[in-house]
């Protein structure tokens, strides 16, 4: 069988640039070399695309040139990558693109739209699901429409915070109380999230979060366990065994995810068998609520006092580092890391083939 060429894309103009590089390195190392030729494309913090086997390491070190400069051409008649060469403009053939771009410009539908314009296969959720999964305000509205239980929350725009902060504080205290969490609506990996237990901490939390986004989410805080479920599929969807995060810090913030060695992942989560099915069913409903495809990780909050389950959020491009929950949950469910990557590629190709069935011009009635 002829090998397929997979282009893993990482880095990007995002606060999660470093996380993306770490995830991508794990994927590049684990892709099946008997089936795939693997290319690595790094996007620097200015948005330039670089191709090379050492591009991840070069981006980490700031060692320029990072690799061979390339451009992506969103033209369905000659789609894909072109090397920067004013004479030859040599194309770089790619069968499937594997975006590993966490955060804005990567998992928000931006690069997915580029792939769609070029009509090329890619791994993961499409434009709509990616955009809805990135914007927590839209995500929560879709969850509400699907009758998925959520904790009380508010959406606050940056300009409202800057022009009427006293009113915002009063509204948060009246409707949510303390503790509460403030987070950017369009960031992942817990970047910019803070817990507030009083007014001074609330002000500091808002001032930090507005550095990352114009739209903020404020959620009521309760005493919870953090449960996560991995989802895999297109129209036919399966869910993994649930896992539990026991954070080293008070909550699972950026440092707890990527720096603290004493955060623990309990896989499978120590929950009742009946609750396992509940989490899995809700995870699949959340995935379908955003019209997901390929993969997602769905995060839940389990109230330690009442036992109530609340959906927290869906992550359409979860971390793939060696300590990331998404691949670990599938390993515990019976799908090893390398096989998981192959399945994701197959799902991306299947969705592409399904899309090619759609007419691009008006057809006569049957």
UniProtKB/Swiss-Prot annotation:
Binding site for Mg(2+) 2: 313, 315
Catalysis performed (reactions): 2 D-alanine + ATP = D-alanyl-D-alanine + ADP + phosphate + H(+)
GO biological process, one term: regulation of cell shape
Alphabetized GO MF terms: ATP binding; D-alanine-D-alanine ligase activity; metal ion binding
Binding site for ATP: 173-228
Keywords of this entry: ATP-binding, Cell shape, Cell wall biogenesis/degradation, Cytoplasm, Ligase, Magnesium, Manganese, Metal-binding, Nucleotide-binding, Peptidoglycan synthesis
Superkingdom of source: Bacteria
Residue stretches making up the ATP-grasp domain: 140-346
Root EC class: ligase
Family recorded in the similarity comment: Belongs to the D-alanine--D-alanine ligase family.
Protein name, per record: D-alanine--D-alanine ligase
